[in-house]
């Protein structure tokens, strides 16, 4: 069969029901047979049938690329599959000829990183963008929950205060709580109080509570009294009228009297009403 006729069949036939008498040989001639998988048919924009079983087209593309099956990759791309999945599949199986061919369709490794679950593949993908530094890798590891990458480079990060502080604050901003705890506990952070600024700004009560646990553990391990610091944060959230944060600070040892005094001063009636009803 001529290549032009095959191309026409690959484009037009998949949107129709394939005749039952089309055996593997005919499908191979039409370019609609996937070795070891079976017949291919497009049924929707994002769905195909593989041997009559539905599968998302991008998942099929990832598998085809992981097998190094150039013909099927090209077919699925012509059906509007996302080329990022071709790069991921090829990276996982180390088909670097396919990686570089289809990476040109994407151009930026950072657009591919959210699709990757494996830390080794994640790092290999990031290396495709030559100008990027290790600091950039660490930053995206935080954003995409790739803690194993930070663990791998602990020796490199140890003592790099500026980078560790940046990663810590990024983890706080992105609500990556496991990262927050690990970075503070393993790498060490000079300015933990930035956590509270971010938590209050983003109204993130979980992060705010986590910050208190970190601060209390730090100060108690050094034999220090946390009361002054707790009341410092309490004043901040009381002035802003943030009742859930006020209550959380009191729970950890902040002064209820300070909260009531500031609520009166700044006329936060909802806070006053809460305490007047005797709930705390």
From Swiss-Prot:
Keywords: Early protein
Presence of keyword Nucleotidyltransferase: no
Keyword Cell wall biogenesis/degradation: no
Highest taxon, organism lineage: Viruses
Induction: Expressed in the early phase of the viral replicative cycle.
Pfam families tied to this protein: DUF249
Family per similarity comment: Belongs to the asfivirus MGF 505 family.
Function of the protein: Plays a role in virus cell tropism, and may be required for efficient virus replication in macrophages.
Protein name per UniProt: Protein MGF 505-3R
